[in-house]
Amino acid sequence: MTELARLKFYATQPHPCSYLPEEQATTLFLDPSQPMDTQLYASLSEVGFRRSGDHLYRPHCQHCTACIAARIPVAGFSPNRQQRRILKRNAELQVIRKRPSFNEEYYDLYRRYIEQRHADGDMYPPSRDQFATFLVRDLPFCCFFEFRLHGRLLAIAVTDVLPNGLSAVYTFYDPDEEQRSLGRYAILWQIAETERLGLQAVYLGYWIKNCRKMNYKTQYRPIELFVNQRWVALT
């Protein structure tokens, strides 16, 4: 923490919260001039920071503490019955690791996902510039995991591979393949990949109890939440 204490951070002005409409949000960002090396990113992930594009951030709201960083310690994970069904349903998918890049196949999948799954969110309408700025970053730890069925692209899990685990940045998938539960499968695959790499945890971002889009994360057990500056197991 001594090294982190020397870093500069900047807070945004209060703005409407994307997840809880009745709340005002403030976000704390690492100084954009600070080089984002892998070890620094890993250290900040241990204290609840996330990456979006070229920025590392965490919530810093004055009157709300609903956003709580969550991670899955993979050593203790065992899929439940529903999760085993999802794994079986998608066992034939091929996963390919790629460097982040822009192409029309990726963008078409992203566009259809946003239009059909998140038309009520602040990422709608999608655009090529939005896709590139948000996800296509030339960073040494970032990769696209493609999920393909007989060559057809079904999903991409944008993932940061860190010394302490995998950080699940964003996953988008074919909205016409709802029966496959591809978002859940991507998390289950990332858990298995983290364990295969001998790493500690999958960092899932923020859990928000009263937000349907963000409270699904506690379906994965065991799970740890970053509360009062330490990771605690949710019981």
Swiss-Prot record:
GO MF terms here are: arginyl-tRNA--protein transferase activity; leucyl-tRNA--protein transferase activity
Provide the GO biological process annotations.
ubiquitin-dependent protein catabolic process via the N-end rule pathway
Listed Pfam families: ATE_C (PF04377), ATE_N (PF04376)
Q: What is its EC number?
A: 2.3.2.29
> Where mainly found?
cytoplasm
Q: What does this protein do?
A: Functions in the N-end rule pathway of protein degradation where it conjugates Leu from its aminoacyl-tRNA to the N-termini of proteins containing an N-terminal aspartate or glutamate.
Tell me what this protein is called.
Aspartate/glutamate leucyltransferase
State the species of origin: Pseudomonas paraeruginosa (strain DSM 24068 / PA7)
- Give the gene that encodes this protein: bpt
